[in-house]
Amino acid sequence: MKAYTYIEKGKFALIDKPKPELQEATDAIVRVTLGSICSSDLHIKHGSVPRAVPGITVGHEMVGVVEEVGADVKGVKVGDRVTVNVETFCGECFYCRHGYVNNCTSPHGGWALGCRIDGGQTDYVRVPVASQGLNRIPDSVTDEQALFVGDVLATGFWAARISEITPDDTVLIVGAGPTGICTLICAMLKRPKRIIVCEPSEERRAFVKEHYPDVLLTTPDACEEFVKQHCDHGGADRVLEVAGAKNTFQLAWRCARPNAFVTVVALYDAPQILPLPDMYGKNLTFKTGGVDGCDCEEVLRLIEQGKIDTTPLITHRFPLDRIEEAYRIFENKEDGVIKIAVYN
């Protein structure tokens, strides 16, 4: 089978690999029907993910059909359409029991697929601890509707949840890339008083304006003053930093009112500075960390009910044998791309 593979820093390639086999009784083999490219894949390509293992098949956003299950797998069966969770987690350790599955202490725990073990930009993938990592897709939900459940949408849902958004809040979302838009969609479920999105790209601001017309829009240069003008208490009540650009962390906390929550969703290629002398007196609460992807079943229900729709994010579609072209478009942000669906 063909598999898009991390060869070395700066180089991915589509190569031949054998079809995976069950290794443990808790494994499942999934035939990938649809996948996508994530910015985290680009972080691997450029050497920003030290734990990524050269030689692995990349890709952690995928849906598919269960082809084979180990003897101990529960909850899914052969023939089920499923989402695949970006996080591999045992469900039994201290962190899993408390809902912090990103910190699972099992050998497979955390981000394994497409990072430490073979992922989903291929025809078949072995999913460890499949009882936890697979969720059955409702019959009325299409593959494209479910495509982002296991990662980028789970990230947005997690970010909105831990931000403790209330109906009285003004929410600032920094960044309107794929994760930022998924975060916006999930923040809207909380029905805050207003949402402001800060995004430098005119194309992406236009996308937000078209699909989410009630959202207020600004740019990084104008953001601080814009937030002051549109907030009741001199700053945003909740700030979700989803951009991960050079100065966006600083922008996020500066735009927060005293005693606000700042949730850092983004990944950074370089360390960020926390200027405590400048921040003294703001009494901010910071929340950080990787997605705790334990909400996938609930997210699928919301999609089934028509309360979440991420299909507008899919701007391009490519077959697996053209994945190099798809990566070029995604990495260079060409042709108005937001997300790319890769089909088999």
Predicted ranges, named:
Residues C38, N85-N135, D139:
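Cysteine-cluster motifs in flexible loop/terminal segments that predominantly coordinate metals
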Residues E199, A266, G290:
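Conserved acidic E/D residue at the C-terminus of a beta-strand in Rossmann-like folds
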Residues R136-D221, E225:
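Mid-domain Rossmann-like dinucleotide-binding core that forms the NAD(H)/NADP(H) cofactor-binding site
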Residues Q23-A25, K77, T166, R257, ...:
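Residue-level recognition of short, solvent-exposed, well-ordered loop/turn junctions
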Residues S163, R205-T285:
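Glycine-rich cofactor phosphate-binding loops and adjacent beta1-alpha1 units
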Residues P200, E225-F226, Q250-R254, G293-N344:
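C-terminal hydrophobic helical "lid"/dimerization subdomain
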Residues P20-G35, S48-R97, P138-V141:
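Glycine-rich beta-strand-centered segment in the early N-terminal region that forms part
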